[in-house]
Structure formats: structure tokens, C-alpha cells
Amino acid sequence: MPLAKRIIPCLDVDHGKVVKCINFLNPKHAGDPVEMAKSYSDDGADELVFLDITASSEKRDILRGVVEGVAKAISIPFTVGGGVRNVSDARLVLCSGADKVSVNTAVVETPKVITELADVFGRQCVVCAIDARRNRTPNDGKIMVDTAEGKLWFEVVTYGGRKPTGIDALAWAKQAEKLGAGEFLVTSMDKDGTRDGYDIELTRAISERVNVPIIASGGAGEPKHLFDVLTQGKADAALAASIFHYKNYPVPIVKDCLRKMGVTIRK
């Protein structure tokens, strides 16, 4: 029997409030993180991801009080990211109630942090977030992928999508796995907030190159989009925000739709 796929709501938090952005820009207030987290937990979400989206760019600590409030309100696994730079930061987050930490900018800049985190907490606690954009500039040093738009490569971006790095996302995923990443949260910055579907080609390209679970993120607008990324995109989990926040498709409805489409989903 195939492993059950996971459905994961995401709380993008900016200064204590859940917001929703398009391409990580122009945030709009969407609700209170503790109230929304409890609602998702009660609705049957498999996990929850909490991302402090400005902690890295503002070079500040994560909002520990909000993390503690969310942890007390839910009964499902809980990943926290944004502003986690080292073992000390991760320990604070995990001691505040998180089950896993998501790391992004800090480990792109200092890759050995992945190994340090895995050595202390176990690789099952380390989620490596990869924010990527399509880059159509020919480059002999990159892994070119055949897509519907032609050959291109996927570039890692950091600081909430604000800074291009020149790093190939597929090569970075392989490196991060070797360093100790236990899971990847792959976000298409081209698709984020658009509600027109995930970047199937990005998700599939990374999934085919690593041997740890992949959470797909960026672009969910309807249940069919989740179906596509969980099947064609070979993702192990689908993360979404807008369709859940604005009640377009509540978690139970999405799960029911996916089951009817033949996807094995957790109860």
C-alpha cells in the first residue's frame, strides 16, 4: 500500500499576525495564528507549518510567544521556520513546542548548520526549505531541466525571495540531504500566492534527486492542484495557505476530493 500523503496548512506570520502574500510581497492580514492553528488541527490537518516570514530579513529572533501559543492549541505535528540560524535558535523553537524546525537562508549561507542541527536533534527534526525561481539564462554549470517552457534551471533565492543566490536548487537539495536534512519544503516563488497550481516540474525534479520526503508549496488554488503535485509532482505532502485561510476549500473537503481522485490520504 502506498504511503499516505499529507495535507499541511501554512501560517505565514508577520509580527504576530497571519498574512497572505503574492510572491511573498504585499502581505494581507488573514487572521490570528493561534485561532487558525486550532481550527486546522480540529479540522483534520495532518501537520502545520508556521513561518515567521520577516525574521530573517529583519535579522531578529522568531516570535517565541506565538509559537508557544500555537503549540498549546493543537494536537498535530508542528514545524516552525524563519529566523532559525543555529542550534541555539532551534533549541528555543523546539522547547517552545515545535516538533521540527525549518531552515532556509541561514543554511544556504552556512551549510554546515544542517549537520550541526541533525547531530543535536536528529535529522527527522530538520526541514530544509528551498525557495526557488525559474531561470532561463543558459548556464553550463547548472542542472538544466526540460519543461513546457523549454530548458531552464531553478535558482535558490533567500530572505523570503528577496535575494537571488546563483545556486542551483537541484544541486543544493542533494548537498543538503548529504549534510543531514530529513525533509524538504520546496516553494516555487513564481507560483506562490497565484492560486494557479504548483510548479510540478520543480517539485518533481527535486523529488527524483533526493531520498527524503518533499513538501510542495506555492500555488494551490483548488483540490486538483494538490492532486497534480502529489501525483505528477511526486510530492509526499502538499502545503497550502490561501485556499484554507479564506475557506475556499476547507481541509476536510480537500481530503475528501483527493480520496475520490484515488490519492491515499491520512484520516
Regions found by a protein language model. Give the residues of each.
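Conserved anion-binding
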Residues: V13-H15, V19-K20, A98-L185, D190-K191
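Structural preference for beta-strand elements that scaffold enzyme active sites
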Residues: R6-C10, E47, S75-T79, K100-S102, ...
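Glycine-rich, proline-tolerant flexible connector loops at the mouths of alpha/beta enzymes
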Residues: E47-G65, T105, L185-D196
